[in-house]
């Protein structure tokens, strides 16, 4: 009888894309894969080709809100729905990637004595994973951190989709219309873009395009028409098809420091200048992610508070100067093969070679 696994995680792309990396590899090993998510979450849009089961999920907030009361009832309902689904499926394992949909699933699995493995992408665990730690047999960590549950924790890195690693440099250059005479700088700030990065790049664009061919993923509704005619500069809101070729064409990256993005850079061995989301706009996870990558020699960091035309140019020049050093450090990383590491832990846990 085939082994069976349930994946869960959602609410944001960061809680889904590592699962997307796992799905084809699990199927290749003959494992039956199911997904539990919400009806209106991004996971419902992104997950294809495997059975998808819907439950309710309520958000647990760290601050006072009237929605906290109604969401408690959603969590209770979701727990009951998850328990019913898991009782019917009887999987060998639940792999929970985080996001609030994973909480009722992990709790229900523990109640039914189904093993649970958590994966934490960020340097510090999000609230959903904190609520599931006691229910888990193992916790896969993207970062080499000390936690209160070290006996359960395993350093794995974060799973990255294999298709992102299979791009063609020449195809990427052709798509962008670059001739390869200059280093290619990839600039990205997530699906919504990063206005602070966009503004700094725009202010330095003349000098930057003298040194680099630039592909700039500016985010939804953030294109700058004034730059359309500029040589060695291509802007997009975002790229879906052919992103792997764009990655292959890039020599350097300028980016926020969300866990998914920086582990993609690590797997690609793409040196990056990271501008973490400031504490005023986050729980500080990007700051810690970036500091870790800089300490390991995988990237350089420029805080948003210090970001301007001059500091950006200087930091990118320094990144280019030390590019080969960073590539060597990334090549020696134990976290780079997050996909293989997590697959091995799952296989070991359910007895699949």
Regions found by a protein language model. Name each.
Residues 2-10, 27-74, 305:
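Conserved nucleotide-sugar phosphate-binding/catalytic loop shared by glycosyltransferases and other
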Residues 4, 32, 110-170:
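Active-site-proximal region of nucleotide-activated glycan assembly enzymes
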Residues 20, 24, 41-50, 169-171, ...:
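Donor-nucleotide binding loops and adjacent catalytic segments primarily
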Residues 64-93, 111:
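An amphipathic, basic-hydrophobic alpha-helix
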Residues 91-93, 236, 248-263, 270-271:
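Acidic donor-binding loop of glycosyltransferase active sites
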Residues 318, 335-353:
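C-terminal alpha-helical cap of glycosyltransferases
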Residues 324-336:
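A short, well-ordered alpha-helix in the C-terminal region of glycosyltransferases
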